[in-house]
Structures are given as C-alpha cells and as structure tokens.
Amino acid sequence: MWLLLPLSFLLTSTAQDGGKLLEGEECAPHSQPWQVALYERGRFNCGASLISPHWVLSAAHCQSRFMRVRLGEHNLRKRDGPEQLRTASRVIPHPRYEARSHRHDIMLLRLVQPARLTPQVRPVVLPTRCPHPGEACVVSGWGLVSHNEPGTTGRPQSQVSLPDTLHCANISIISDASCDKNYPGRLTNTMVCAGAEGRGAESCEGDSGGPLVCGGILQGIVSWGDVPCDNTTKPGVYTKVCRYVKWIRETMKRN
C-alpha cells in the first residue's frame, strides 16, 4: 500500500517513477474551476478544491508549514489572466487523522483573502448523499504523467514528467465489496474507491489532495492506493467527503 505523497516529497526523493494521473488527458482549460494548486516554498505540492470563497479542502497528508494557494490555474508555467494567489491563515487537518492507516485524510484551509469568484474560479458543491457504485466521476491533478520515449535499445521506454497543464481522467465509483477484495482489512466507511475498468487507479503521487467530482459534486479527495500505481489494476482510494460534511461545516463556522 502507499500514500499518495505530496509532490514536494517526490521531488526530493529517489527512484519515484510511479507518480502520474494514469491514462488521463489534458483537461479543457478551466473546465474544473474549483481545482486548486497548493504550493510549498515555491514548489507545487498538492491539489485541492475550492469549497467557498474563504475555504479550500485537501488531504491531511498534504499539510506543510509554508502553504500558498493558487486558484484559476491551468498551465502552471503560464499566466493567462484568471489566476489568483492566496495565503492560508489557518490549516486545519482532521483531529483524528492517522497517517499510518490513512484514516480521516482530510484538511481545511482558510484563506486570508477570499477568492474572487469568476467563471474560472468557483466553488465545487459539497455532497448531500454518498456516491453510488458505477457513478461516473472525473479526477484531476498536476501529478506526474507518463509518455513513451525511444530507449537505448530502440524500444519505447516509459518516462515520467511533471505536466504544465491540468490533467483529467474519467473513472467510476467501485463498490465497497469489490474494493475490499483489493485492500482486505484496510478500508473504512470514510473511504471510497474509484477507478477505470481494467486500468486501475488513474490517480497517483502528485495528484494528492485533488478532487474526485461526480456529476458536479465533490465526492472524494485523492488519498492512497496500490504501488506501483502505474502497474496496477487496483482502484485508487479516496477520502469519502459525504462522511465529513458535518465536520466541514462546523469547522468553517467556528473559524
């Protein structure tokens, strides 16, 4: 098993070749207007979701001391107008978060200055129900992507690189019973599995904290899965947002 590590960790580690949004393609620019990029000391670290003008939701394992929030992004290396830079005044991981078991892998960030809502920057809707097996969803992120390059023998070899642009993958919700067969004894009722038939997780390291959106509703946060994620048919595991709506709303109200 593995945790979907923040990209800042991967960039300072060795031999981390698995991190990518598998089989994903570049998203239509600003088609995911709730998508957030979290930065640490000037480096892209994790994904996140805008849920209100003042609040961003991500994974607790993305927590760091120096977090900057970038909204309205598509190409991280170019500015085309709608981008907004914000600072987090409060970083609030779930009080029961457990790094070892991945339980309660959810975190709220309060922005010092609220987001200015535009067609390219707007909140995603929180769920009023939990997702159903087979429900169609989209996972998005700037995690590492793979591509084939000619190798020294002339045969194509898989290479990985950090994409400039936001990538999306179409996946669907996997039933708890089916997912439990892949991760026996590891799942809780605060986790949900999603993947693509015969292709596995789709999300991988670097996509951490990003949104799993089903029918315009935020149903999951990229959390953990199998390793190596570019060579598995097991689904990815996401924090099940519907189980945390009460905590989210109460925390926002108190802060």
From Swiss-Prot:
Disulfide bonds join C46-C62, C137-C214, C179-C193, C204-C229. The keyword Glycoprotein applies. Its main location: secreted. Glycans are attached at N170, N231. PROSITE patterns: TRYPSIN_DOM, TRYPSIN_HIS. GO terms for biological process: proteolysis. Residues 16-20 form a propeptide. Keywords: Disulfide bond, Glycoprotein, Hydrolase, Protease, Secreted, Serine protease, Signal, Zymogen. One of its GO terms (molecular function) is serine-type endopeptidase activity. The active site is at H61 (charge relay system), D105 (charge relay system), S208 (charge relay system). Residues 21-253 are annotated as: Serine protease. GO terms for cellular component: extracellular region; secretory granule. It comes from the Eukaryota. SUPFAM superfamilies: Trypsin-like serine proteases (SSF50494). Pfam families: Trypsin (PF00089). InterPro entries: Peptidase_S1_PA, Peptidase_S1_PA_chymotrypsin, Peptidase_S1A, Trypsin_dom, TRYPSIN_HIS. Gene3D superfamilies: Trypsin-like serine proteases. SMART domains: Tryp_SPc. Residues 1-15 form the signal peptide. It is found in: Secreted. Its EC number is 3.4.21.-. PANTHER family: KALLIKREIN-15, KALLIKREIN-RELATED. Belongs to the peptidase S1 family. Kallikrein subfamily. Protease whose physiological substrate is not yet known. This is Kallikrein-15. It comes from Saguinus oedipus (Cotton-top tamarin). The gene is KLK15.
